């Protein structure tokens, strides 16, 4: 899938689960729950133990329509390893020089972080397909709305602090998609083995996104 189609697909999916978990086992359990909740993309942050191996495993077990993301990519060597493992898109919390070009060359997408107007514009000029507005919680939906007003042509993905309590507000403010971190996984239920609750909680984000798109 070419990068523009990847970006379009992410926009259609609307919610990107961003997994940052303390153990590989917890990450595997969370992935299983997200798949059962009918998510079609997952971003695995590289702060998760064995993240690249998990990424490779997820790529092998899912079809072409499922998008696998690598998050918290901070250097080009790691970016290439993620691409080699099958990542469809690379995500950084800040501008990583050359990462977008690496993704372009591989036909993959790059989501580059920025928060201020200058950082957002720099990420876009660097070649980001989507700008990850991070940490979104520092400014909330009002900040995103202000950024969107200045750069209406730039696809924005607020990440960091997005929850089921404010997801609708982020879409109203101009988000093309949202990245949801550990709010999407009920950690206590996961640890207790209550898969049904974890799945239902995660699925509620998809339902809210569908509601936002219908408005």
Model-based region annotation:
Residues 20-22, 48, 68-76, 92-96, ...:
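Glycine-rich beta-to-alpha transition loops that act as phosphate-gripper elements at the mouths
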Residues 1-86, 105, 153, 164-165, ...:
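Conserved N-terminal beta1-alpha1 strand-loop-helix module at the mouth
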Residues 35-40, 62-65, 83-90, 104-111, ...:
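Glycine-enriched alpha-helix->loop->beta-strand junction motifs that scaffold or abut catalytic
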Residues 30, 75-85, 118-126, 143, ...:
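Catalytic cores of alpha/beta
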Residues 89-102, 133-141, 175-195:
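Glycine-rich phosphate-binding active-site loops on the catalytic face of alpha/beta enzymes
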Residues 122, 138, 143-157:
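Shared catalytic-loop signature of beta/alpha-barrel
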């Amino acid at each position: 899938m070419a990068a523009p189609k990847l970006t379009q697909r992410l926009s259609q999916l609307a919610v990107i689960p961003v997994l940052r978990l303390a153990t590989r086992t917890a990450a595997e359990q969370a992935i299983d729950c997200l798949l059962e909740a009918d998510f079609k993309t997952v971003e695995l942050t590289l702060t998760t133990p064995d993240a690249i191996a998990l990424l490779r495993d997820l790529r092998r077990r899912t079809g072409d329509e499922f998008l696998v993301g690598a998050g918290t990519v901070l250097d080009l060597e790691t970016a290439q390893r993620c691409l080699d493992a099958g990542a469809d898109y690379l995500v950084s919390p800040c501008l990583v020089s050359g990462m977008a070009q690496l993704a372009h060359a591989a036909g993959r997408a790059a989501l580059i972080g920025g928060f201020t107007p200058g950082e957002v514009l720099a990420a876009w000029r660097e070649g980001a397909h989507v700008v990850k507005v991070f940490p979104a919680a520092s400014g909330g939906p009002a900040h995103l709305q202000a950024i969107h007003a200045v750069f209406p042509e730039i696809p924005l993905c607020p990440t960091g602090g997005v929850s089921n309590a404010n997801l609708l507000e982020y879409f109203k403010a101009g988000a093309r998609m949202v990245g949801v971190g550990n709010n999407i996984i009920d950690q206590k239920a996961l640890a207790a083995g209550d898969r049904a609750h974890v799945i239902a909680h995660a699925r509620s984000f998809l339902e809210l996104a569908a509601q936002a798109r219908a408005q």
